[in-house]
């Protein structure tokens, strides 16, 4: 199985759907779904996903390289792994999504969207995770969902962690720092993301890794993500990574800006970077007679997007944690 990405993009099913790798067994579970199981018993299970948005190609290329290293035998596998390329049709078309944003659909939220390939795919991925986690006895469950951002950022690499009722494990947060993440953003409310689904339903330690800016296939400079690729390689092979000398800055979400109608106006231009700072009282958005302003001394914006569909998030406002 040395052509997983090509088969996924072409919509082709391989003639052989299971086999042996270097110290592991593999199974093709469907387009964009590949299960890897070490020959030796392990108690760790990992979801490695990318391509939930079809225009975010750098993480897909990173996963393709990791798979090549595993199948060539240059990288040892010490986890049960489910590799997920989330939205094959959008990846093949080079667009963010074909109908609706899949990363708002998980946890059954796909039922509130008009039926489409993306709603069906979200349901398929939910079932795939359920099958994967229920078929093993993993003591440790991780989910790393790799993305790139639409906009540039004051932090080139950062992580977004779902709302969680229990404390985050220190080794997981330390690994995120070792993977080169410059900032971690902690959600305070449930959401429809893939990582919130895996965390809420299966107790996985989950993080959305934002790695640079969205570019087409072949135009990514993967060298700027070497530290992340090296950390992923070390993780898969069971090698402990050194702790980052500069731990990631930490932020938490304090409010969400939502577009409800065509009257919505977001007062941020296309040059506004993620983590741009705004002072207390700054007018951020208006919609009819509703005004959205900064309520803390300073707040930072994440994912500003004035052109989202009505009812969806147009931005998150953050505060820095000590």
Swiss-Prot record:
Record GO biological process: arginine catabolic process to glutamate; arginine catabolic process to succinate
Amino acids binding Zn(2+): 53, 56, 147
Cofactor: Zn(2+)
Cofactor binding annotation: Binds 1 zinc ion per subunit.
Active site: residue positions: 210
Any Pfam family the entry gives: AstE_AspA_cat
EC main group: hydrolase
Role: Transforms N(2)-succinylglutamate into succinate and glutamate.
Name recorded for this polypeptide: Succinylglutamate desuccinylase
Organism: Salmonella paratyphi B (strain ATCC BAA-1250 / SPB7)
């Amino acid at each position: 199985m040395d052509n997983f990405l090509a088969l996924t993009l072409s919509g082709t099913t391989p003639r052989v759907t299971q086999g042996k790798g270097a110290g592991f067994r593999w199974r093709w579970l469907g387009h964009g779904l590949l299960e890897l199981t070490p020959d030796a018993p392990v108690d760790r299970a990992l979801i490695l996903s990318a391509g939930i948005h079809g225009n975010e190609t750098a993480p897909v290329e990173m996963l393709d390289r990791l798979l090549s290293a595993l199948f060539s035998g240059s990288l040892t596998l010490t986890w049960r792994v489910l590799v997920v390329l989330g939205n094959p049709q959008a990846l093949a078309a080079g667009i963010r999504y074909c109908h609706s944003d899949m990363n708002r659909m998980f946890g059954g939220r796909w039922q509130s969207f008009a039926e489409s390939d993306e709603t069906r795919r979200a349901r398929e991925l939910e079932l795939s995770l359920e099958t994967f986690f229920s078929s093993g006895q993993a003591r440790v469950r991780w989910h790393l969902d790799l993305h790139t951002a639409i906009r540039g950022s004051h932090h080139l690499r950062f992580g977004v962690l779902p709302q969680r009722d229990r404390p985050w494990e220190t080794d997981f947060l330390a690994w995120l720092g070792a993977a080169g993440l410059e900032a971690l953003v902690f959600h305070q409310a449930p959401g429809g993301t893939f990582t919130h689904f895996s965390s809420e339903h299966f107790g996985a330690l989950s993080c959305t890794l934002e790695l640079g800016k969205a570019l087409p296939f072949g135009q990514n400079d993967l060298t700027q993500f070497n530290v992340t690729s090296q950390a992923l390689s070390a993780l898969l092979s069971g090698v402990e990574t050194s702790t980052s000398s500069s731990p990631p800055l930490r932020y938490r979400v304090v409010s969400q800006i939502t577009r409800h109608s065509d009257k919505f106006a977001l007062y941020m231009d296309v040059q506004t970077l993620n983590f741009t700072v705004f002072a207390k009282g700054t007018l951020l958005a208006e919609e009819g007679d509703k005004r959205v302003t900064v309520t803390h001394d300073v707040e930072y914006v994440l994912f500003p997007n004035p052109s989202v569909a009505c009812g969806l998030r147009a931005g998150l406002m953050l505060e820095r944690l000590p």
